[in-house]
Amino acid sequence: MGSSMHVGVIGCSGRTGKVIVSALEQSSEYTLGPGFSRSSALTLFQVIAHNDVLVDFSHPLLTKEVVAHLLISPKPLIIGTTGFPGKCKEAHDSLEELTHIVPVVVCPNASLGAYIHKRLVMLLSQLCNPQFDIRIRETHHRYKKDSLSGTAQDLLDTIQQVKQEDWGEEYEVGQRDSSKKTIEVQSSRVGDIPGEHEVAFISSGEQILVRHTVFSRNVFGRGILSILDWLKTLNPQPGLYSLGDTLELVLRNEHCLLKKTTDH
């Protein structure tokens, strides 16, 4: 992929979509291509044809359509749409088919801090025994339609997987119940908060709390640029990738810069 990579944003009129569009407009590494929204003059096929990479932060039904179009005209895809592919078998199958053709990055939250937060939650899920109750609490702006957020759902899935693999315990979502292991999940939609996710591990005598708070939506734009850097630099093979796969490059680069600074 060349330095003049054209990037199209699906869902370009949404809150996150606008942030990504702004980040691309200010970038010297990438060219903002035509995007797609409800008011687009171009068809989805035309938008795909005019771009080298697609970034999708839209709606599960539209993302499903995007994947179907890309199976005909393959392009690398970054998906940040909440609830995709969800439990829809057809969406899962189409996405899997696309990953055999092009690299696809699925990232419910594109910020570096969210990735670090998730890693910490994974570690605590391994270390905290079943005597610790677990609570996930997420807060977003009043206009956010989805509840649970994609990031909170990803944290929930991560905790359930780790508890199953490391402790052999099945955790369900719900209020605390002595007869089964549960994870309490709370959602709040207030004000203009870009996003806050908090996971608590609570025993009878202590609490461990990890929280990630977004102060500016610009972090999502920077995160997408980091993923694009990864695509351009490594030119990965077709496959399904996570934000963690792409941010390892960013973390290594930052470590090298820090080492150079301290060496001087």
From Swiss-Prot:
GO cellular component: cytosol
Chief localisation class: cytoplasm
Pathway where it operates: Amino-acid biosynthesis; L-lysine biosynthesis via DAP pathway; (S)-tetrahydrodipicolinate from L-aspartate: step 4/4
Residue sites binding NAD(+) per the record: 11-16, 80-82
Sequence positions that bind (S)-2,3,4,5-tetrahydrodipicolinate: 141, 150-151
Pfam families xrefs: DapB_C, DapB_N
Superkingdom of the organism of origin: Bacteria
Keywords (A to Z) from UniProt: Amino-acid biosynthesis, Cytoplasm, Diaminopimelate biosynthesis, Lysine biosynthesis, NAD, NADP, Oxidoreductase
Record-annotated active site: 140, 144
Gene Ontology annotations of biological process type: diaminopimelate biosynthetic process; lysine biosynthetic process via diaminopimelate
Residue stretches spanning the membrane: none
Enzymatic reactions: (S)-2,3,4,5-tetrahydrodipicolinate + NAD(+) + H2O = (2S,4S)-4-hydroxy-2,3,4,5-tetrahydrodipicolinate + NADH + H(+); (S)-2,3,4,5-tetrahydrodipicolinate + NADP(+) + H2O = (2S,4S)-4-hydroxy-2,3,4,5-tetrahydrodipicolinate + NADPH + H(+)
Top enzyme class: oxidoreductase
Gene Ontology MF term list: 4-hydroxy-tetrahydrodipicolinate reductase; NAD binding; NADP binding; oxidoreductase activity, acting on CH or CH2 groups, NAD or NADP as acceptor
Enzyme Commission code(s) on record: 1.17.1.8
Localization per Swiss-Prot or TrEMBL: Cytoplasm
Chain sites annotated for binding NADP(+): 38
InterPro entries in alphabetical order: DapB_C, DapB_N, DapB_N_CS, DHDPR_bac, NAD(P)-bd_dom_sf
Role summary: Catalyzes the conversion of 4-hydroxy-tetrahydrodipicolinate (HTPA) to tetrahydrodipicolinate.
Alphabetical list of NCBIfam families matching this protein: dapB (TIGR00036)
Family to which the UniProt record says this protein belongs: Belongs to the DapB family.
UniProt-recorded name of the protein: 4-hydroxy-tetrahydrodipicolinate reductase
